[in-house]
């Protein structure tokens, strides 16, 4: 039995002069294998679409491009592959011209949409990595959907030459009724042009984009490692009051938030914490919170900005308290009843660009005088400016934190994109290389090799849904839940 050539993206029966024969018993094992590939392709892509629909964690903008790719792959598996197998079995086309045109249209449109879906997915990852915060404003489901519709619209443009080539070119091509092929199958210039637009140009651009993505992610990871090596995380910061008596409970073990929340106690042991509207009546001897090194000071701007004024209930109490104040460019923390000698301070000029510091002074007595109250009010006003400054710093570092989280997600997404692109190029490039050869040399064609390159391109639609759970934990968990697979 004569082995027919199959129609595929940019290919229509160009190997007529090199036909080979194959007996029907020899053909059946191949048909079984190809049919299995077809069923697996349909099943896996349906699983991807159902997973995205049923799992809220997968309702992301990035996964809209995955859905577009899965729809294209589903069309390849549900329409293009089965009709190719049928054509292979029949050895000739006997289903009529309308069904032939439908098959050719689905083949061209789905294959092109699959390529364009990978392309716009690559662009999305590129912009997310290169401009993470700026692109977040524009990375909406509406814009992503519009981009996807644009890609599918361009793919459907294939219908125009498939259905109306003779009408637009005002020519009549000789067509064999037992073959399913386009009217432009022997027009070399058109096929070369469409090959460049459909494959070679998008592939080169994707490789360039991915090189930029890889470089940006690598630089970001190195930058984060450098920061993490020089600046501790918020949970690692320790503010420790100097305690010459060596109390059993070391304040240095407390987190910054716990230190700020520590309440003063009255003579009877009761805690007193007054609202910010109340002015402290007394300021006992101030004490510094010592740091291991200067680099930790910069993290103090991450304090929650619930600044409170605290006051001792009874004069002469030996209980300690903390008050946040700023005077003459210094941030002081005060503790009552602690006598220290010798002043020391930690500068953070290099970290914050000003002269804020933690200081310890040698005073163990404080009298409630009018001048003292005036200084407190002045310090309170100055502290207000510090709060504004701190809030700006907090917002700046919050943006950096959000950017860091976003980059971590994009690093995983870049890994997924890398696998998708590798599968795409490995599956399609043999066919397009072979296509360019036979476009200029119609006799340089081996039918078996040609069929192999065609189906290798189709198999890309089978591999794509296997890549998603491999590189995405949410996909993996959702697949296991749907298939009732225990971890």
Curated annotation (Swiss-Prot):
Gene Ontology terms for molecular function: histamine receptor activity
PTM annotation (Phosphoserine): residues: 230, 344, 347, 380, 396, 398
Membrane topology designation: Multi-pass membrane protein
Keyword Glycoprotein among UniProt keywords: yes
Biased composition regions of type Basic and acidic residues, renumbered to the chain: 238-261
UniProt xrefs under Gene3D superfamilies: Rhodopsin 7-helix transmembrane proteins
Chain intervals for the UniProt region annotation (Disordered): 238-292, 345-377
Post-translational modification note: Phosphorylation at sites in the second and third cytoplasmic loops independently contribute to agonist-induced receptor down-regulation.
Entry GO terms, CC: cytosol; dendrite; plasma membrane; synapse
GO terms under biological process: cellular response to histamine; chemical synaptic transmission; G protein-coupled receptor signaling pathway; G protein-coupled receptor signaling pathway, coupled to cyclic nucleotide second messenger; memory; positive regulation of vasoconstriction; regulation of synaptic plasticity; regulation of vascular permeability
Chain intervals with Polar residues compositional bias: 353-370
Chain sites annotated for binding histamine: 107, 112, 198, 431
Annotated glycosylation sites: 5, 18
Stretches for region Important for agonist binding: 107-112, 424-428
Primary location recorded for the protein, binned into one broad class: membrane
Domain notes: Histamine activates the receptor by forming hydrogen bonds with transmembrane domains 3 and 6, squashing the ligand-binding pocket on the extracellular side and opening the cavity for G-protein engagement on the intracellular side.
Family: Belongs to the G-protein coupled receptor 1 family.
Name recorded for this polypeptide: Histamine H1 receptor
Organismal lineage: Eukaryota, Metazoa, Chordata, Craniata, Vertebrata
